[in-house]
Structures are given as structure tokens and as C-alpha cells.
């Protein structure tokens, strides 16, 4: 399959965040997440959802640049999503469930390269005299990559129809390795200790992530319940895992229900989903440098997060209600995202402190209400979404024109309208 992708974006100027916290953008260029991709329009071409695979019965092997979405989430995922462009990778996977006496098994093993964005932060002050470094183009990084190898497996036990249990594990090199990559880096998943996280084919350190997930489908009720629990920082040993399971954790939980209103052709589709990436208090005193984040290391591809796209240390919950009839879907959606709480709780925001102290109530939150639409006409599928968003404390900015009180700082609140439209042509 050859399905390339081309992206054009205005990449307009925007105010830089008041402070770049380590959970958002590392000032030392450790985590490749630019606030802005240079000053020109963003134009990129990718091989997209292309692949070459050989199918051998229930198994497939090949090369691919497809996006991978692991986990049960409907709106988000923890370890692998379509937020970043697809990674070019080798894949060995099942193309249909493998039947065993204990139930069915599905899985995928990948090994590939995640690329740098091609932008870095300068070390000196900006031209306007501010202390935040600028994002500048670095063409020498266009060919620099690091290695990622990952696997996911799903078991559907024969004794509990409708239940799926899954596990994922990802290993990647920290920092660019480029031509110094060893063959061992591409198979690090098979020999890296799940507790110590040590070992690699080169001098480059490795990092790892893992998750457990489930999905329970109730066909007679037209409903499902699902969840995922992820770990970003490897444990010292089994004791550490059992004593502090909340360390470096993220979780996702959701519920979906289809309520028939006219036979099998018309439904009300209700979904509720929560994604929590903000770390627990365990992470403040451990090796995440005092920043309560998930994705604390360089888990990015072309400068975009491979996992959930809501941002490090962010939380999201979504409620959607759709009317579905034949080929048409229309409905309402409410979405709340608390962005970059890691920066807030680490004191990395430009608030003017009140007499009471630092104001931790001023979270950077997007509260959005919108409509969804999707309908197919012959070979063409049209879709669209419009969101009216009220943003509180945008970018953690302080508003000097606001009215303060002894207990609260002045947040900068804004409104915006976001419209998304698209179509897919089936050939």
C-alpha cells in the first residue's frame, strides 16, 4: 500500500510560554518538542500510511510507516497513537487472532527509527532581550535519529467472552545515536532488564515504557468498558513496583454505550473517557527532576509526541453524545484539557505571587463545547468538528490588567473557535 501524506500549516507567530518547564520543553534540548517549528510555514511530506508486507497465514511481516495505535482508548492513548507522523519501522504482527485452547492471541513487534524535528533552542537571550531561548533551524539534525523497539500483545480468554487483556512495552535510546546505532539497539526489547533499564548496543542510554490495558465488551447491552495503566519510569526491582505502583503512572479509562432507538439502523452513541498524564506526588521526589510528568524523556518523532497529544503533565476528559443513523453521525462533544500541570506544580509559571503564596488554583485549562458531523455519500466520507473553547489562564500567563485579590493571581482568559473539516475518498 502506498499512501503518502503532505502537511501544510501557517505556523504563525505566537507568544512563547512565560517559562519553559522541563515537562513541556527542555531548555537543554533534551526533549525534542519545539514550541514552534521555525518562522516559516510548516511544509512536510511523509511516506504516511504506506507499507510492504508479506502475509503468511495469520501472520504478517514487512516494512511500514503506518501510524500505530495501541490500547483501548477511543479518543486518546498512552503509549502509541497517531499524534505524531508514523515511524518507519520493521513489523511482525498478526493479521487475525491466533486460536489457542486458552483463547485467542493478537500481537505486534516493531523496530524502527524516530527522527529529530530539525530545530534546537539557542543558548543565549533573544533579540528582544528576554531570557527565553529562540527555536532555530538545525539542518544537521535532519538525518539524526534514535532507535525504538516495542511490542504489544492481546489475549482474549476463552472463559470470559468479550474480555480482552493487553500489555505493551517500549524501549528507545535516549538522545540521538545516528550512525552509531548498533544492531543490538534494534532488538533491545529482548535483553533489556525491565527493572534496571540498563544495557544497549552502544554507549547511549535507553529508556522504557510499559502499560497494561483491558477492554470488556457487552454485546447484548451494546456497551463496552475499557482502561489502560502505563508506567514511564522503570522500577528498581519488584519491591519498588509493588510498594509504589503510582510512581510515573498514567491512566486512561472510558465507557461507551450504543442505545438503539429504531431497530438496528438508528442509535444514540454515548462515550465518556478520561486520560490522566499528570504524575502523582511520588514523582516530585524521584528522578523526574521534580516535575510531575509522563513522557519525561525524549519520546518524540519529528518533534511531536508519539503518545497522547495533550501534552506532558496534562489531563483530559471527554463526553460525547452522537445520533447515528445509517451513514450519518451528528452529535455534541464536551472536552476539558488541563494543560501542563507539571509546570504549575513545579513553580515554572510566571505568576505574581499573592500574599498567601504561590497560586496553584490558576491552572491552564481549555473548556470546549462543540458539534461533530460525519456522513458518507458513495465513495466520499465527509467529516467535520467545530469547538467553541474558553481558555482559562492561557499559557500560564499573568494578566496585569486583571483585578486581583489577596488570595488569587490574575489569569489571562481567552475565547476561540476551532473548526476542522475533511473528507476521505475510497477508491
At which residue positions do the language-model features occur?
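Outer-membrane beta-barrel channel domains
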Residues: 1-159, 241-249, 262-273, 292-312
Amino acid at each position: 500500500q502506498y499512501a503518502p501524506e503532505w502537511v501544510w500549516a501557517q505556523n504563525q507567530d505566537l507568544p512563547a510560554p512565560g517559562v519553559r518547564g522541563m515537562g513541556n520543553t527542555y531548555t537543554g534540548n533534551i526533549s525534542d518538542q519545539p514550541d514552534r517549528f521555525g518562522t516559516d510555514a510548516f511544509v512536510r511530506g511523509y511516506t504516511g500510511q504506506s507499507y510492504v508486507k508479506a502475509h503468511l497465514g495469520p501472520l504478517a511481516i514487512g516494512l511500514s510507516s503506518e501510524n500505530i495505535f495501541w490500547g483501548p482508548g477511543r479518543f486518546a492513548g498512552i503509549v502509541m497513537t497517531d499524534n505524531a507522523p508514523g515511524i518507519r519501522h520493521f513489523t511482525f504482527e498478526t493479521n487475525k487472532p491466533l486460536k489457542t485452547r486458552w483463547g485467542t492471541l493478537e500481537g505486534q513487534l516493531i523496530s524502527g527509527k524516530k527522527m529529530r524535528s530539525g530545530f534546537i533552542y539557542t543558548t543565549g537571550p533573544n533579540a528582544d532581550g528576554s531570557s527565553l531561548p529562540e527555536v532555530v533551524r538545525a539542518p544537521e539534525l535532519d538525518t539524526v535519529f534514535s532507535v525504538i523497539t516495542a511490542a504489544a500483545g492481546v489475549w482474549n480468554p476463552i472463559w470470559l467472552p468479550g474480555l480482552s487483556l493487553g500489555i505493551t512495552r517500549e524501549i528507545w535510546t535516549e538522545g540521538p545515536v545516528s550512525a552509531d546505532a548498533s544492531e543490538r539497539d534494534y532488538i533491545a526489547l529482548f535483553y533489556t532488564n525491565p527493572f534496571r533499564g540498563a544495557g544497549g548496543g552502544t554507549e547511549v542510554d535507553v529508556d522504557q515504557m510499559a502499560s497494561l490495558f483491558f477492554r470488556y465488551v457487552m454485546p447484548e447491552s451494546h456497551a463496552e468498558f475499557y482502561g489502560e495503566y502505563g508506567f514511564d519510569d522503570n522500577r528498581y526491582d519488584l519491591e519498588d513496583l509493588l510498594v509504589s505502583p503510582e510512581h510515573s503512572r498514567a491512566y486512561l479509562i472510558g465507557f461507551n454505550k450504543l442505545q438503539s432507538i429504531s431497530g438496528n439502523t438508528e442509535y444514540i452513541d454515548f462515550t465518556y473517557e478520561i486520560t490522566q498524564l499528570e504524575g502523582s506526588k511520588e514523582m516530585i521526589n524521584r528522578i523526574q527532576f521534580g516535575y510531575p510528568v509522563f513522557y519525561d524523556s525524549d519520546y518524540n518523532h519529528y518533534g511531536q509526541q508519539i503518545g497522547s497529544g495533550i501534552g506532558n503533565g496534562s489531563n483530559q476528559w471527554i463526553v460525547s453524545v452522537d445520533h447515528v443513523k445509517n451513514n450519518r453521525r451528528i452529535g455534541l462533544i464536551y472536552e476539558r484539557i488541563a494543560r501542563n500541570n507539571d509546570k504549575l506544580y513545579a513553580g515554572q509559571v510566571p505568576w505574581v505571587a499573592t500574599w498567601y503564596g504561590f497560586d496553584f488554583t490558576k491552572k491552564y485549562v481549555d473548556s470546549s463545547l462543540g458539534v461533530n458531523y460525519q456522513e458518507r455519500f458513495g465513495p466520499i466520507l465527509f467529516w467535520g468538528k467545530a469547538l467553541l473553547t474558553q481558555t482559562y489562564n492561557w499559557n500560564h500567563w499573568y494578566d496585569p490588567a486583571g483585578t486581583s485579590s489577596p488570595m488569587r493571581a490574575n489569569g489571562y482568559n481567552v475565547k476561540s473557535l476551532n473548526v476542522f473539516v475533511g473528507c476521505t475518498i475510497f477508491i
